[in-house]
């Protein structure tokens, strides 16, 4: 019987099989998701050379209290005995594993709110944010730090060093040839923390909003804006402009829906770089949003979906169709100051809103949402129709504005300036400009 050697065939087949496995292993290293948010919530802080667990969102005062390192700051005269907290540096640390973000082409470390003066380090080296510095100095801005390519395999070490705000403010004040009545104005920080007639002085620091990695491959979809260009009794016309950042020429399907009904569906060819898309929707016989006491505060669910291969990116905002106008007409005694909603003048019955907690990170999570809802429900039940957010506090959390939308409460939003002379140098103004841009974009889709 003639014998045939199968070994060479097996060897060739095995080599092909090995190449096949290695090739697809390399390809599969790339994460199949468009976008992923990875929370960084397990942090520690150092006090007297010892590490303690920290809560994020949080602040140093609540972290000290939760670890029983201080007593209740609101009891008796403890406000005076706890002023040392705001006068020293505090260090927060965490670690993350490189495997958490492997497979993503783009990764940024994001602080949605960090209070206030801090330096950021990765593995002992300064981590630069998109403006080319590792220092942050505004609690009302989002700060983004692109991660470098040379991360360590395994554990990587993040460190946030908080610098005392009063020390910075005194140093800035000493540069002036005159004395200011308030030094707090040099920091873009909640003014009320420096003490007010209604509350104590607790100059705190910390990560008062979430901290996370923003990871993406191929495309990144930006927030859409709701632009109402026409509204009458028969129809409404809205545009939903947004941007998509693309690594290459790509095809995506863009769908825009209102309350689950599709009003726009197009296949779009993206170019490499930034792409502006502007879906337009026409809604027949829209129900209008009215302030409390005038009618129903009708809200629609506006949704944009971007389909890219098997991935779907989805973004939602609730919106009320309405017109709001401030009418100022010259008369015999000056100028009128009249709000007109959906063509009808409205008598404003308002309330002044100050922060609901001395430590504002306490308004995060379920407990904070419940408190927002209860306080705003009291405003609605008192027949009020407008809430003014005082400029000595903060730009509020998203839950606050959502409940105002639902309850028919107009919001008069101050920029955060109050009862002080503020610097006018170019650096300060540029910082405030970025703050204003970020907050306007964040809040613009509330009716």
Question: For each of these PLM feature ranges, what is it?
Answer:
Residues 344, 403-407, 440-447:
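Acidic (Asp/Glu)-rich catalytic clusters
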Residues 428-446:
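An active-site-proximal structural segment forming one wall of the substrate-binding cleft
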Residues 339, 347, 351-357, 415-428, ...:
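Substrate-binding/active-site clefts of carbohydrate-active enzymes
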Residues 137-143, 392-396, 431-435:
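Short, glycine/acidic-rich beta->alpha junctions
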Residues 1-11, 15-19, 29-387:
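Secreted/periplasmic carbohydrate-active enzymes, especially glycoside hydrolases
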Residues 375-382, 386-430:
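Aromatic-lined substrate-binding rim segments of carbohydrate-active enzymes
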């Amino acid at each position: 019987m003639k014998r045939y050697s199968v070994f060479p065939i097996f060897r060739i087949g095995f080599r092909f099989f090995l190449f096949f496995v290695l090739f697809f292993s390399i390809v599969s290293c790339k994460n199949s998701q468009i976008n992923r948010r990875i929370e960084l919530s397990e942090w520690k802080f150092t006090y007297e050379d010892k590490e303690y667990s920290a809560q994020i969102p949080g602040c140093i005062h609540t972290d000290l209290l939760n670890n029983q390192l201080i007593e209740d700051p609101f009891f008796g005269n403890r406000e005076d005995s706890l002023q040392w907290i705001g006068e020293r540096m505090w260090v927060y640390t965490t670690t993350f594993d490189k495997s958490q973000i492997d497979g993503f082409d783009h990764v940024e470390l994001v602080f949605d709110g960090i209070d206030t003066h801090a330096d950021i380090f990765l593995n002992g080296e300064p981590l630069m944010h998109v403006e080319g510095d590792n220092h942050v100095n505004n609690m009302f801005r989002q700060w983004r730090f692109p991660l470098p390519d040379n991360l360590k395999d395994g554990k990587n070490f993040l460190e946030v060093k908080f610098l005392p705000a009063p020390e910075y403010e005194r140093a800035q004040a000493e540069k002036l040839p005159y004395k200011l009545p308030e030094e707090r104005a040099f920091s873009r920080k909640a003014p009320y923390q420096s003490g007010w007639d209604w509350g104590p002085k607790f100059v705190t620091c910390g990560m008062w909003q979430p901290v996370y990695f923003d990871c993406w491959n191929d495309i990144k979809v930006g927030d859409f804006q709701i632009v109402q260009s026409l509204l009458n009794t028969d129809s409404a016309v809205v545009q939903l402009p947004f941007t998509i950042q693309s690594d290459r020429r790509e095809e995506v399907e863009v769908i825009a829906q209102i309350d689950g009904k599709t009003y726009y569906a197009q296949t779009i060819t993206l170019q490499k770089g930034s792409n502006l898309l502007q879906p337009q929707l026409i809604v027949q016989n829209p129900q209008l949003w009215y302030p409390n006491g005038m009618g129903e505060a009708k809200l629609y669910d506006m949704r944009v979906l971007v389909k890219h291969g098997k991935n779907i990116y989805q973004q939602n905002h609730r919106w009320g169709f309405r017109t709001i106008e401030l009418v100022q007409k010259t008369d015999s005694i000056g100028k009128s100051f009249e709000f007109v909603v959906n063509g009808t003048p409205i008598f404003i019955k308002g309330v002044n809103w100050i922060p609901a907690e001395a430590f504002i990170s306490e308004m995060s999570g379920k407990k904070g949402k419940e408190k927002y809802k209860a306080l705003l429900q009291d405003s609605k039940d008192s027949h009020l129709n407008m809430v003014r957010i005082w400029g000595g506090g903060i730009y509020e959390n998203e839950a606050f504005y959502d409940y105002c939308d639902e309850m028919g409460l107009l919001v008069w939003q101050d920029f955060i300036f109050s009862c002080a002379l503020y610097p006018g140098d170019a650096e300060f103004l540029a910082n405030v400009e970025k703050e204003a841009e970020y907050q306007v974009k964040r809040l613009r889709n509330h009716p």
